[in-house]
Amino acid sequence: WEGDDGLDVPYQDMILYKVHVRGYTKQYKLPAKEKGTFAGLGEMIPYWKDLGINAVELMPAYEFFEILPEEEKTGMVTEKRREGKVNFWGYMPGYYFAPKSAYCATDNPQREFCDFIKKLHKAGIACIMEMYFPAEINGVIALRTLQFWKLYYHVDGFHLSGEGVPMKLILRGKLLADTKLMFPGVDMDSAFH
């Protein structure tokens, strides 16, 4: 990690910029290979610095299905019916322990995401990951997901959404005690006091 330890931007000082990895970088004058990728986001850092941004929130950027299968009422699924609807946003269960490979300019999603985080931190910008946990998720899996992204990828915080967020379990653990946690309806400053 070349000395990277993450950033601790106080809530009251945070100037947060929320982006969708694919959607945000498609419009910019980037090399075609970098459009819609973590590498492409890395090229936006000087612009964010000019705006005074000190934290970037990534909408779901973990591995998730892009094509949603259609539910069949009766009968068998056929090849024709496999197309489904495109899931652009990622607000669904996924493979929570992996960066979205479709958001990579390289064939190494882990390395590309780590390089992006290091660039952000060198520029003084924190990374907040938005994670969606549905009601049916095991709370321990959700907790381990957050711990993993903090330890392995040096993510600075999380915006948690969905009915399956185990806030009590998350708040009891010490590993996330110095991590930014945002959750609708919870005043995080008072939650720890």
Regions found by a protein language model. Give the residues of each.
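The feature marks proteins involved in alpha-glucan
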Residues: W1-K18, K26-A32, G36
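Hydrophobic faces of well-ordered beta-strands that scaffold small-molecule active sites
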Residues: I15-Y17, V56-L58, C127-M129, F158, ...
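Conserved, mostly hydrophobic/aromatic
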Residues: V19, W48, L58, Y96, ...
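Aromatic- and acidic-residue-enriched carbohydrate-binding clefts of CAZyme catalytic domains
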Residues: L30-T37, L68-K122, F133-V155
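Catalytic domains of carbohydrate-active enzymes, especially glycoside hydrolases
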Residues: E43-Y62, Y152
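Surface-exposed amphipathic alpha-helices with a cationic face
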Residues: P46-K49, C114-A123, K168-L176
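Active-site-proximal loop/turn and secondary-structure-junction residues that shape catalytic pockets
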Residues: Y62-F64, A102, M131-A135, G164, ...
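Active-site-proximal helices and loops of the catalytic beta/alpha 8
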Residues: Y91, T145, L151-H193
